[in-house]
């Protein structure tokens, strides 16, 4: 209940700042919008991870319960309109160490994946109805998280029925070719991300979508799907 109250206060203030910016300028800038990249529902089991304080600890059940209350408070209870848009991050199997996050390949068993790393995300998607999900920097089971058939197509949208938008972590799409070495360049990375359902990129990579279309690596239909 306390977490719900905290998130409600956050979204109250966020709404106020949003409307104030619109009245003053006619538009909003960074930190004046209604999309909140929170909560962080990664499981904190490695003390080397310097961002552990953002999470709710090592327990998947507790994390899911606390984060669900946060999402409901942030997004509000109107059946038609969102008060603000929450974002479940970082999807998935992202728990440090921070130094290796741009190139790390998380190898986990199916049991570890479903029992430890995914339950909080599932609860936010299927019960709290979180509006967005942020892909992690790392690879999971050899697939980059922001273009993972397993995580995005099969589980998130296939098993859980997620119908919100997927956003990359900032510069995660550049990691495809700079660190993970799974693509050749930015245009190739944009095509791969669109193919597996990353709708929004937090870096320059999606600026190369026209090049990817010209090459025949992606299609306008996939761009339209991301914009739906």
Positions of predicted regions on the chain:
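Glycoside hydrolase catalytic-domain context in secreted enzymes
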Residues: 1-228
């Amino acid at each position: 209940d306390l977490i719900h109250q905290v998130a409600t206060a956050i979204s109250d203030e966020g709404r106020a700042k949003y409307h104030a910016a619109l009245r003053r300028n006619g538009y909003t800038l960074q930190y004046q919008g209604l999309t909140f990249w929170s909560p962080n529902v990664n499981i904190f089991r490695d003390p080397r991870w310097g961002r552990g304080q953002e999470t709710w600890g090592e327990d998947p059940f507790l994390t899911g319960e606390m984060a669900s209350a946060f999402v409901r408070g942030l997004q509000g209870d109107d059946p038609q309109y969102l008060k603000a848009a929450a974002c479940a991050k970082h999807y998935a199997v992202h728990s440090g160490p921070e130094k290796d996050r741009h190139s790390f390949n998380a190898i986990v068993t199916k049991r570890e994946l479903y029992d430890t790393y995914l339950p909080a995300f599932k609860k936010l998607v299927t019960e709290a109805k979180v509006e967005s999900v942020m892909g992690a920097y790392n690879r999971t089971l050899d697939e980059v998280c922001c273009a993972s058939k397993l995580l995005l197509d099969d589980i998130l949208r296939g098993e859980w029925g997620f119908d919100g938008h997927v956003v990359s972590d900032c510069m995660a799409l550049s990691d495809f070719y700079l660190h993970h070495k799974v693509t050749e360049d930015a245009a190739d990375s944009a095509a791969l991300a669109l193919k597996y359902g990353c709708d929004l990129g937090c870096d320059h990579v999606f600026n190369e979508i026209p090049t990817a279309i010209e090459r025949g690596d992606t299609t306008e239909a996939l761009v339209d799907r991301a914009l739906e």
